[in-house]
């Protein structure tokens, strides 16, 4: 499992859910929406570790 996603705070989890719901409302499949948000979270986490 992805440690980046496992270490999210409750607030970050809620934000991710909201982003996924917005993408689904725009017509993106739930699986694709989850993949998009997960990648965004990984990218954000990676950038913060590079600092």
UniProtKB/Swiss-Prot annotation:
InterPro entries (UniProt xref): UPF0181
Q: Which superkingdom, per the lineage?
A: Bacteria
Q: Which family does it belong to?
A: Belongs to the UPF0181 family.
| Name this protein carries in UniProt | UPF0181 protein HAPS_0710
Instruction: Identify the species of origin.
Output: Glaesserella parasuis serovar 5 (strain SH0165)
